[in-house]
A protein has these predicted regions:
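Alpha-helix capping and inter-helical loop/turn segments
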Residues: 4-6, 150-151, 163-168, 179-180
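Ankyrin-repeat boundary/"N-cap" motif
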Residues: 125-148, 160, 168-178, 201-204
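Extended compositionally biased segments used for macromolecular assembly or nucleic-acid engagement
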Residues: 77-123
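Charge-dense, extended regions
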Residues: 158-163, 172-209
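A conserved mid-domain beta-alpha-beta active-site/ligand-binding segment of alpha/beta enzyme cores
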Residues: 27-83
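Concave beta-strand-loop units of leucine-rich repeat
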Residues: 5-6, 11-17
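Core hydrophobic positions of leucine-rich repeats
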Residues: 1-6, 21-27
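Gram-positive cell-envelope targeting signals
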Residues: 1, 61, 69, 74, ...
Length: 209
């Protein structure tokens, strides 16, 4: 099963409470990603899963994945005539887009399950989100949310915390989620009020004096 790219979680033996705790921490998903995405079979070690050194190595592998060129693997895929990413065929334009989305799915997961996540790694992951926000040449950080997690508020919170919502892209973000739940739209509008409108109000106040 380790060769199955759709493997989502590996559940380790333990009490019901232990299994529930690992699920909340994302340990089972981290273990699955270690072999399906990060391709590090040394991390497939149930005796060390969740320990400090294991988490550190996992995060190092994630950062190494983000550092890879988005066309990495394309030449081999093309020359071998294989299919990648859930059985779909890709050309030189669509391949890097899907590669970034794959990376971003893991980034979002790690930020949502910040078990023993260091500040340095967290800052690096958030900076990666910002490089792919709405309004950039490669806005997949936003596209992943809209296409796959449109109604999941936690994803918008991570997106906002990373600094991906700006005055320049706010109107476009709001347009993209016009058909989303009221909770999502309220979150964005509240963010605008707290971060942008207040600044405008202070600027107007300064002009008065």
């Amino acid at each position: 099963f380790l060769g199955c790219r759709r493997l989502r979680e590996i559940v380790l033996n333990g009490t019901e409470e232990e299994r529930a705790l690992r699920t909340s921490q994302g340990i089972g998903r981290m273990l699955a990603l270690a072999v399906t995405i990060l391709h590090d079979y040394f991390l497939f070690d149930p005796t060390n899963v969740g320990k400090d050194e294991w988490v550190k190595r996992w995060d190092e592998k994630l950062l190494a994945l983000l550092a890879l060129d988005d066309l990495d693997g394309f030449e081999e895929l093309w020359t071998c005539g294989e299919e990648d990413y859930e059985g779909k065929d890709y050309d030189i334009k669509s391949y890097p887009v899907e590669k970034r989305k794959m990376k971003l799915r893991v980034v979002y997961f790690r930020l949502l399950h910040a078990y023993k996540l260091s500040d340095i790694v967290k800052d690096t992951l958030m900076a990666y989100l910002c490089r792919h926000t709405k309004g950039t040449d490669a806005p997949e950080a936003w596209e992943v949310i809209v296409e796959e997690h449109r109604s999941e508020l936690d994803y918008y919170r991570i997106f906002a915390e990373a600094g991906c919502i700006t005055e320049d892209n706010f109107a476009d973000l709001l347009e993209d989620i016009k058909d989303s739940d009221a909770e999502i739209k309220a979150f964005l509008l509240r963010y605008k009020e707290e971060h942008f409108d207040r600044k405008d109000a202070f600027a107007a106040f300064d002009l008065m004096w």
